[in-house]
Amino acid sequence: MTQIIIAGAVSFLVAIFTTPVLIRYFSDTGRGQEIREDGPKSHLRKRGTPTMGGLAILAGILVAYVVAGLYGLLTGHEAFTASGLLVLGLTLGLGAVGFADDFIKLFRHRNLGLNKTAKLISQLVLALLFGFLVLRFPNDAGLTPGSTKLSFIRDLKTFDLAVGGTVIGTIVFLIFMYILIAAWSNAVNLTDGLDGLAAGVTAIVMGSYSLMTFWQFRYSCATNFAAGCYQVRDPLDLAVLAAAGLGGCLGFLWWNAAPAKIFMGDTGSLALGGLVAGISVTSRTELLMIIIGALFVIETVSVVIQIVVFHSTGKRFFRMAPIHHHFENGGWAETAVVVRFWLLAAMAAMAGVAIFYGDWLTASGIGVGA
């Protein structure tokens, strides 16, 4: 537990003190966010706001993971595990893609940033590499960081992507990894449209995963082989990463809350999407993440609906997509949209954690007959 607290605290401190350094640098050099002319008119005042604040979040996560890991090694706990390093690598890799996108926008003055093909190929390479490696590195019990079985709270034995054999199964799994990682990274990116929205929602999701992965560690089959135990390779290291993500988002949110003094940019949003995807895969909760991260799902679905309806009928289903802009254009203040969406995200996360805990009660036999 101390290791997890250290990760959250260190990440928060690094992010909260690094962010103003970025604000000063980008303000002094006159490099700031461009604002869409077709967006909400109230957003035009944000033109020139410093961006790439995701660097502070990533710095917090990286430093916290190393510090907490060193503490873990000194105290005899697991640290720098295959699961943790793979998730961290995915997070930093997608952060690098986002950084390239932001860099081109700010320093090369190309408003569209990294072209779609380059971004697509970069995400594809990272997803395939993560998917390939996550099925390697078995521990003494034969557990790998990921599994070809679809997982809700535990692996679903009836839904194995490798049912067609090793070769076909691996191909199907890699395709699934790409869809999953691209979906979550782009979902967080779409949510990052209002001051504090993406950082706040991600903090809620990471807080939930800090609790759940710690619970998986406490009742791991590796140390406590009993009814209801969890077959997860490195739950404590995942809890450390989730806590680091929570701390980093909160430290950044201090400066990103309305009126934002800095935006996270694609550097932050793509990286945090990778963190969400990676932890869901390695904690064996890919499907549960749909509930816990429901706000991200809603934002993404609203864009899909808008595109499909517009191409089918020539009319818009929402005033503007993603859906947070729909409410803005309907007269809601930006802060009202953000706080209400935080509340929705918190309710979804609580529902997910409740389902997770309810499953443990049932699987362990404690909830039987209650």
Swiss-Prot record:
GO molecular function: metal ion binding; phospho-N-acetylmuramoyl-pentapeptide-transferase activity; UDP-N-acetylmuramoyl-L-alanyl-D-glutamyl-meso-2,6-diaminopimelyl-D-alanyl-D-alanine:undecaprenyl-phosphate transferase activity
InterPro entries hit by this protein: Glycosyl_transferase_4, PNAcMuramoyl-5peptid_Trfase, PNAcMuramoyl-5peptid_Trfase_CS
Pathway entry: Cell wall biogenesis; peptidoglycan biosynthesis
GO biological process: cell division; cell wall organization; peptidoglycan biosynthetic process; regulation of cell shape
Catalytic reaction(s) noted: UDP-N-acetyl-alpha-D-muramoyl-L-alanyl-gamma-D-glutamyl-meso-2,6-diaminopimeloyl-D-alanyl-D-alanine + di-trans,octa-cis-undecaprenyl phosphate = di-trans,octa-cis-undecaprenyl diphospho-N-acetyl-alpha-D-muramoyl-L-alanyl-D-glutamyl-meso-2,6-diaminopimeloyl-D-alanyl-D-alanine + UMP
Principal location class: membrane
Keywords from the named record: Cell cycle, Cell division, Cell membrane, Cell shape, Cell wall biogenesis/degradation, Magnesium, Membrane, Metal-binding, Peptidoglycan synthesis, Transferase, Transmembrane, Transmembrane helix
Membrane topology, as annotated: Multi-pass membrane protein
Domain of life: Bacteria
PROSITE patterns: MRAY_1, MRAY_2
Compartment(s): Cell membrane
EC number, UniProt record: 2.7.8.13
Cofactors named for this entry: Mg(2+)
GO cellular component, one term: plasma membrane
Residue intervals passing through the bilayer: 3-23, 54-74, 79-99, 118-138, 161-181, 197-217, 238-258, 262-282, 290-310, 341-361
Family: Belongs to the glycosyltransferase 4 family. MraY subfamily.
Described purpose of this protein according to its UniProt entry: Catalyzes the initial step of the lipid cycle reactions in the biosynthesis of the cell wall peptidoglycan: transfers peptidoglycan precursor phospho-MurNAc-pentapeptide from UDP-MurNAc-pentapeptide onto the lipid carrier undecaprenyl phosphate, yielding undecaprenyl-pyrophosphoryl-MurNAc-pentapeptide, known as lipid I.
PANTHER family the UniProt entry points to: PHOSPHO-N-ACETYLMURAMOYL-PENTAPEPTIDE-TRANSFERASE, PHOSPHO-N-ACETYLMURAMOYL-PENTAPEPTIDE-TRANSFERASE HOMOLOG
Protein name (record): Phospho-N-acetylmuramoyl-pentapeptide-transferase
